[in-house]
Structures are given as C-alpha cells and as structure tokens.
Amino acid sequence: MTTQRSSGLLQRLVQGSLVKQILIGLILGILLALVSKPAAEATGLLGTLFVGALKAVAPVLVLTLVMASIANHQHGQKTNIRPILWMYLLGTFSAALTAVVVSFLFPSTLQLTTGATDITPPSGIVQVIHGLLMSIVANPIHALINANYIGILVWAIGLGFALRHSNQTTKNLVNDLSDAVTFIVKLVIRFAPIGIFGLVASTLATTGFSALWGYAQLLLVLIGCMAIVALVINPLLVFLQIRRNPYPLVLTCLRESGVTAFFTRSSAANIPVNMSLCEKLNLDRDTYSVSIPLGATVNMAGAAITITVLTLAAVYTLGIPVDLPTALLLSVVASLCACGASGVAGGSLLLIPLACNMFGIPNEIAMQVVAVGFIIGVLQDSCETAINSSTDVMFTAAVCQAEDARLAKSALRS
C-alpha cells in the first residue's frame, strides 16, 4: 500500500506541471547548498548540461521555424511583426525612463577602485551599429555555431522567401524538419527542473550572496526598477493592446518564461522555452517564430535599466550635475545601446562606458563601473534576463490576442 502511494506521488511529480517541478528543483537546490557545499558544487554539471543543451538547440530551432513559417506562409495572412517590434522599442525606452526617475528619487553611489576587467568596450554607437551590420552579413554556418541570432534570422527569412517558390513536397519537408526540431526542444525543456536544481545549488555554493551586501542600495534600485517595469509598465502596455485585465497574461509569462530565464541567465537559451509557451498560449506560429528570436536580440528592457542605473550611479559618485534634458537623452542613448547589447561581447555591462561618455566620464572610471556590474552580476544579470525574455512572449501574446479580438469583432459585425 505504501509502495503504491509513493509510486503514485512520483508519477504525479513526473507528469505534473513543469512550473511546479521547477519550484521543487529550486527548493532542493537551496537545501543542498545549505547542507553540503561540495555536493552542491558538483551538481553544477547538471545546470551546465541543461543550459548547453538549450543553447545548442536554439539556433537550429530559430532557423527551421522561421524558414518553415515563411515558406508555408499563405498570401494575405497577417503576421503582426510591426506592432510587436514597436512594443519592443516602446518597452525598452519606458524601462530606461523608469530607471532615470527611480535613480533621481534614490541616487546611488559607488566605491570605485582600480579596473577589474580587461574586456574592451565599444568605442561609440557607430561601433555598436557596425557590429550589428556585420552580424547581418555573417556566414550562415558561423551564425549557427556562434548563436548569432541576427544573422540566423536574416538567412532564415531569405531561405524562407526563396522556398516559397518550391513545390509542396519541399515545403512539407521543411515543415517536418521544423516539427522534428520542436520535438527535441520539448524533450530538452522537460529536463528544466534538474537543470535548475544544478544551477541554483552550484551558484549558492560557489558565490553565495555575501559579496553583494556592499552594493545593497544599488541592487535595490536596479531590482526595484525591474520590478516596476515587470509589474506596472509592462502590464500597462499590454492593457493598451488587449483592453482587459493584463495580469493573467503578465503573471503567466513571468512564471513560465521569467523563472527559467532567471536561472539560465541567457535569452538565447530561453528561446525554446518561449516558443513552447507561445504554442501553449495558442498564438500564431508565423508570428511568434519570428518575433521571439527578434525579441531576444532587440527587446532589452532589463539591459536599458542596467545601463541607466549604473551610469547615473557613476555620475552621482563623481558629483556631476544632471538636468532633465540630459536625463531624457540618457534614456534614448540607453535604449539604443540596449538594443545593440546582443551584438556586444559582455552584453549590457560593456555598453556602460558608451553611456558614461555622455557625461565626460573617462574610460578608466567607466570600466570600474563595469567591474561593479560584474560583482553584482549574480542578481543583476539574472533579473535582467528574466525581464528581457519574459517580455518577448508577453508582447507577442498581447499583439496576437488583440488581433484575434479585432477579427472576432469584425466577424460579428458582418
């Protein structure tokens, strides 16, 4: 009888909600880190394997899905990419503006020391744009190997349009290939609880949070900005699209996309998770197969917050006065920098010197600010990725649902 009960419990755990399984993995990871540090460090391999599997399958998934959706696209069918792109840009700018307001209300200062990183940041916005343009014309094999999603998108779109003129057998083959890759992705995602367990246990065992206490106020400002954007600004933008209570959708995206992104700390690795959630929400495949990988490269609200908050912290530390027009200009610059973050090694942190340059802050000091960013990266990068990645699904779903509602109203009127 006891054996039957235990096997029944195990079966419910295995076949139950993935979110609940991830929560169990999270709790077990914390407990293991508290009980045995060496064992927790050893489980880091599970997390590394999970993130590696997601990163490996994501480029192929994007290529096949986009190629298949465009190749099989019916003439006259609407994909809603333009309004989604506008929401991405508006969301990123709103996040930067929020960070400016919060930084004005709660100014933070830094303890600057000697530079702690030898990574070379881009010298200006021209170099960022140059990097993005070079990503567009990248070799397709190199783009797949290096997970260059801008290059992958360009090649997938080009091949998709070319395959529109092929016979139906070829189109079916491309579609079947896309379905096969999607099946592998679903298989990988089922291992998320084990991966999260390994990531949480090893992170707590190796780094802990003791190094973060010295930057408590800065972290509170950063995470506070991200919380405001996630729970106030984004729901407002979603409401303007769907014209009803946005929180069921917002909380679903945060729970099923944001949690995974928080622990993997990779928008690229979270693309398969987002694709799976879009399918679960019954969104238009032609739309989300393009908007999700596009969002992973240009929808960077979290990055805009990081760039703005750390730049203003450096400004306050050095006693540089900031007026309202300059703060607004910083919001624009931070938004542009954030959109280019995917094309820069080191992401948003390495674009801080570019924003600091607005205030005449020397590169040596700006790189010290970057070093602070790396110190708080355990939380900063996790929260940033969670808000970036969950917003990709959120805005895609909002636009798709708004379009479905519009079509339903039109059908009723006619």
Curated annotation (Swiss-Prot):
Location within or outside the cell: Cell inner membrane
Membrane topology: Multi-pass membrane protein
Annotated Gene3D superfamilies: Sodium:dicarboxylate symporter
Database matches in InterPro entries: Na-dicarboxylate_symporter, Na:dicarbo_symporter_sf, Ser_Thr_transp_SstT
GO cellular component, one term: plasma membrane
Transmembrane residue ranges: 16-36, 46-66, 84-104, 143-163, 180-200, 219-239, 300-320, 332-352
Catalytic activity annotation: L-serine(in) + Na(+)(in) = L-serine(out) + Na(+)(out); L-threonine(in) + Na(+)(in) = L-threonine(out) + Na(+)(out)
An example Gene Ontology molecular-function term: neutral L-amino acid:sodium symporter activity
BP GO annotations: serine transport; threonine transport
Keyword terms of this UniProt record: Amino-acid transport, Cell inner membrane, Cell membrane, Membrane, Symport, Transmembrane, Transmembrane helix, Transport
Family the entry assigns: Belongs to the dicarboxylate/amino acid:cation symporter (DAACS) (TC 2.A.23) family.
Protein name in the entry: Serine/threonine transporter SstT
Species per Swiss-Prot/TrEMBL record: Citrobacter koseri (strain ATCC BAA-895 / CDC 4225-83 / SGSC4696)
